[in-house]
Design a protein with these regions (language model features):
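N-terminal membrane/targeting module of cytochrome P450s
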Residues: 1-26, 88-108, 133, 335
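Cytochrome P450 heme-binding "Cys pocket" and the immediately downstream C-terminal segment
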Residues: 102, 280-321
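Hydrophobic, repeat-rich solenoid/adaptor surfaces of innate immune receptors and signaling proteins
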Residues: 83-87, 163, 189-193, 227, ...
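Cytochrome P450 heme-thiolate "Cys pocket" and heme-binding signature region
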Residues: 257-287, 312-313
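Cytochrome P450 substrate-recognition site 1
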Residues: 32-52, 57-152, 176, 181-188, ...
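Cytochrome P450
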Residues: 2-18, 75-82, 146-158, 168-191, ...
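Cytochrome P450 C-terminal beta-domain/meander region
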Residues: 66-71, 223-230, 245, 250, ...
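Conserved cytochrome P450 K-helix/beta-meander segment immediately N-terminal to the heme-binding cysteine loop
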Residues: 231-259
Length: 335
């Protein structure tokens, strides 16, 4: 009891602070000797946690990149991380040094659950024979089931029709289309795997969408745990040294002087190199068919009294739009 009174308490507090500062100093020495790229000075114990706005990570990283350069360091607690920004540096890391940067940090929950390397799936798996085998298997299975083929296009077109019907049912109202879009995407995967789709009210489909959403959030929570290298794809998609109007939707970015489509090397929403998205052909097909179908059938507007959708993303995997409302009105034929 005596120990917790007055001077005893003070001595204990001072001892604890000195102990923490010493441990912190040991970690800092490791950082100094390892010669990390520049970055903001980390706080003892917390690292740079208070210097980044977790609710708007892309903007925080954007400001840091302008201050410290395209490759800079941050510390999450005592864990050092290197953030890579803009086309040139990202290409160098993902493509030129692809072999050295294709690994993924161990996932603590996998260890706790005793998940074996062969059961880690593709996205989070370490770069090794198990990942290679799972990736090859996934690509060939997706192809067998129709990825990149006409048969899948029919499923996606059919689903786009159902999506349009769901929009029609709520035409003229202020809606958040997220749930409908997620159900349509889940149905495409269901078409691939089960060769059938589900009605949007079907409890099974609703459960599936919820599970996918939850698992994605979990993943984003675990990624930073062991991550030392963070590839900031947003900084490539909005690279001011590459795009004419980097912060605007500007279709001319992808058109030549004659109005023909041109590919742009900085357009890499599916990443690049060995760990690039393997579902890209399917995702592109879905985006094209869903968008064209919706835009042909409806005029979209911001409902009266609602703000314009924000261009800031919600920082998860993948980055998602912040909630927004829109109003879809059925187009008159020929307009
Ligand atoms: C618009 C939709 C999509 C976007 C923007 C997207 C984006 C990405 C990105 C940026 C990565 C790299 C992640 C990393 O570096 O760790 C990735 C990986 C991956 N994506 Fe996608 N993706 C999309 C749709 C899909 C679909 C439809 C599938 C499945 C059919 C899929 C399956 C995968 C897999 C399995 C990986 C891990 C690849 C590996 O680590 O080897 N994605 N995706």
């Amino acid at each position: 009891m005596e120990l917790l009174n007055g001077t005893g308490l003070w001595s204990m507090a001072i001892f604890t602070v000195i102990f923490i500062l010493l441990v912190d100093l040991m970690h800092r020495r490791h950082r100094w000797t390892s010669r990390y790229p520049p970055g903001p000075v980390p706080w003892p114990v917390l690292g740079n946690l208070l210097q980044v706005d977790l609710s708007n990570m892309p903007y925080s990283l954007y400001k840091l990149q302008h201050r410290y350069g395209d490759v800079f360091s941050l510390q999450k607690g005592w864990k050092p991380m290197v953030i890579v920004n803009r086309l040139k540096a990202v290409q160098e890391v993902l493509v030129t040094h692809g072999e050295d940067t294709a690994d993924r940090p161990p996932v603590p929950i996998f260890k706790c659950l005793g998940v074996k390397p062969r059961s880690q799936g593709v996205i989070l798996a370490s770069y090794g024979p198990e990942w290679r085998e799972q990736r090859r298997f996934s690509v060939s299975t997706l192809r067998t089931f129709g990825m990149g083929k006409k048969s899948l296009e029919e499923w996606v077109t059919k689903e786009a029709g159902h999506l349009c019907d769901a929009f029609t049912a709520q035409a003229g109202q202020s809606i958040n289309p997220k749930a409908m879009l997620n159900k349509a995407l889940c149905n495409v995967i269901a078409s691939l795997i089960f060769a059938r789709r589900f009605e949007y009210e079907d409890p099974y489909l609703i459960r599936m969408v919820k599970l996918v959403e939850e698992s994605l959030t979990e993943v984003s929570g675990f990624i930073p745990e062991g991550t030392t290298l963070i590839i900031n794809l947003s900084s490539v998609l909005k690279d001011e040294t590459v795009w004419e109007k980097p912060h605007r939707f500007h279709p001319e970015h992808f058109l030549d002087a004659q109005g023909n489509f041109v590919k742009h090397e900085a357009f890499m929403p599916f990443s690049a190199g060995r760990r690039a998205c393997l579902g890209e052909p399917l995702a592109r097909m879905e985006l094209f068919l869903f968008f064209t179908c919706l835009l042909q059938r409806f005029s979209f507007s911001v409902p009266v009294g609602q703000p314009r959708p924000s261009t800031h993303g919600f920082f998860a995997f993948p980055v998602a739009p912040l909630p927004y409302q829109l109003c879809a009105v059925v187009r008159e034929q020929g307009l």
